[in-house]
């Protein structure tokens, strides 16, 4: 519930056998938007680890098609080209990472957020860096009880639409 209005989510969790590109994710988005009753102004992309990287990569090419992204310990190298597309489309971003992640460096998240904010993205790109070891930032990020500014990640997403 956001603003006293209730919403329902359709959650699609594709499992790719190889590293997915933004184009691979777009095939999934297009398939489900053509088959299910989905509000095209409220498509949100999130993922963890490789999926978090896919969220960054998708947004770096198709930012105009989605309402917000929430990458979690996203494994994607920061590029100015992708950051420009995200910033130019004013795509809301809330990224999560553990500072002691031993699989995907927190520098991926820091790089994107710092670059986006240096481009004066509106709204300002947000990140939550947990003081924690290991790769699992998703248990906390996706928890209904973890909130910042009185919003969990789902409530945060729902405040945005295209």
Which role fits each region the language model picked out?
Residues 1-26:
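Active-site machinery of serine-nucleophile hydrolases
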Residues 5-9, 87-93:
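Short, proline-enriched alpha-helix->beta-strand connector loops that line the catalytic pocket
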Residues 19-50, 60-63:
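Gly/Ser-rich "nucleophile elbow"/oxyanion-hole loop immediately N-terminal to the catalytic nucleophile
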Residues 45-47, 72, 96:
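Short beta-strand immediately N-terminal to the catalytic nucleophile in serine-hydrolase-like folds
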Residues 54-58:
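Hydrolases whose catalytic domains are alpha/beta-hydrolase-1, hotdog thioesterase
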Residues 64-76:
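A conserved short beta-strand
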Residues 94-96, 100-162:
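C-terminal catalytic histidine-bearing segment of alpha/beta-hydrolase fold enzymes
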